[in-house]
Amino acid sequence: LTAKHFVPYFKKNKSGVILNIASTAGVSPRPNLNWYNSSKGWMILASKTMAVELAPFGIRVNVINPVAGETPLLKSFLGEDTPEMRGKFLSTIPLGRFSMPEDIASAALFLCSDSASMITGANLEVEGGRTI
């Protein structure tokens, strides 16, 4: 919905960046999270479609797919928030830690910068290796 309002401005200026946030669940689904997984998969595909449609206007569209972080949503992935459940989940992340807001922010800054001017339609997984 936000893109609907920004795209005309971006088209007029022949440049712009749209950055969406999905999740590793969109590329590597977790059990018992059907609707969550599906919504993140939709976001990834919708972003790729937007990237194809908007590239001729100089507009780039990318997605960040973070792994679970220390947020209220973490409990949805863990079930019961215990040291054992955290350890079990962390064992699926090769780098051995949850994402931090700074991890996502750094990826976002890069994708929105001129250093990423040739990147569109990409999914940047900020996930410590979870989807390997």
State each model region's role.
Residues R60-E70, C112, E125-E127:
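Conserved SDR Rossmann-fold cofactor-binding beta-strand/turn motif
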